[in-house]
A protein has these predicted regions:
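Conserved GHKL (Bergerat-fold) ATPase module
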Residues: 1-297
Length: 297
């Protein structure tokens, strides 16, 4: 039958793709890929895209409760976020981003290593729910959205991994997030310092390669009389294990935390302490160690 307005698109499906004619599958795909498009999508009389893309709005137009509701929607939780970062950039590429710091890290509860829950969009259309390389490894606890109009809508996962735009987006987000941490450390230090510290995961001299631990677990393993958390930054675990600074701490049985990601040193400087234990970089000149105990003969 003729339409008064608009366009009718008829799709003929092969037998092996019959599932895409099922109502539940069509709604699932619409909500997954087009949940935030600007125009209303109706399916058999049901309004599908009911959640607003608040990341595309100005911060002044978004209420605090809207941030909380959006975080709960994308992270499937009833909790409010610890903090959020909402920003736009137009150089070197155009993007809108809304990132949330959760109150707790799933890795704390034995769920193993988690992937970042930050989705990549182009003009509010989902490109990849978990794009590789979008965030550095140390930011994998984040939840949120990154939307760039400069990305092609038909870009594949393989192209994303080698795309220079994604690397530029990663650099922008990392720098912005470090500034955000710096602001929290200065303006709301007591509120956020301990919580941020508990989100971090790292390898150490007490873990096998690839196995991570937390500051809380580190503190339970501290030797009697040890007053500080010892840490070392570098490009890789292998590099750190060969550090000349490490020998004196291993000789005294002190665990040393390894941080190998971009921005780690800045984050540790902002953190300063966890549970009243100062985080001390072992390659600094002012580190004091007790004398080694000598064997009684």
């Amino acid at each position: 039958e003729p339409l008064d307005r608009g366009t009718r698109i008829v799709i003929h499906l092969k037998e092996e793709y019959a599932e895409f004619s099922q109502d539940y599958r069509v709604k699932e795909l619409l909500r997954r890929y087009s949940n935030f498009v600007a125009f209303p999508i109706n399916f058999n009389g049901e309004h599908i895209n009911t959640v607003q893309a608040i990341w595309s709005k100005s911060k002044s137009d978004v209420k605090p409760e809207e941030y909380d509701e959006f975080y709960q929607f994308i992270s499937h939780t009833d909790e409010k976020p610890l903090s959020y970062m909402h920003f736009s950039a137009d150089a070197p590429i155009m993007l809108h981003s809304l990132l949330f710091i959760p109150r707790r890290n799933p890795e704390m509860f034995g769920f193993g290593r988690v992937d970042p829950n930050v989705s990549l969009y182009c003009k509010r259309v989902l490109i990849d729910a978990k794009p590789e390389g979008l965030l550095p490894d140390w930011l994998r606890f984040l939840n949120g959205v990154v939307d760039s109009e400069d990305l092609p809508l038909n870009i594949s996962r393989e192209m994303l991994q080698d795309n220079s735009l994604v690397r530029k987006i990663s650099d922008i987000i990392t720098k912005r997030f470090i500034k955000h941490l710096d602001k929290l450390a200065k303006d709301e230090k007591e509120t956020y310092k301990e919580s941020l510290g508990k989100l971090l995961r790292f390898e150490s001299t007490a873990t096998d390669p690839g196995e991570t631990t937390s500051f809380e677990e580190y503190i339970t393993r501290m030797k009697e009389g040890q007053t500080a958390i010892y840490a070392l930054t570098g490009p890789s675990r292998a590099h750190l294990e060969n550090s000349p600074y490490l020998e004196a701490f291993k000789a005294r049985g002190y665990e040393v935390a390894f941080f190998t990601d971009h921005g780690d040193e800045f984050v540790l400087d902002s953190l300063s302490s966890v549970d009243a234990k100062p985080v001390t970089m072992i390659d600094r000149a002012d580190v004091e160690l007790p004398e080694l105990e000598t064997e009684q003969k």
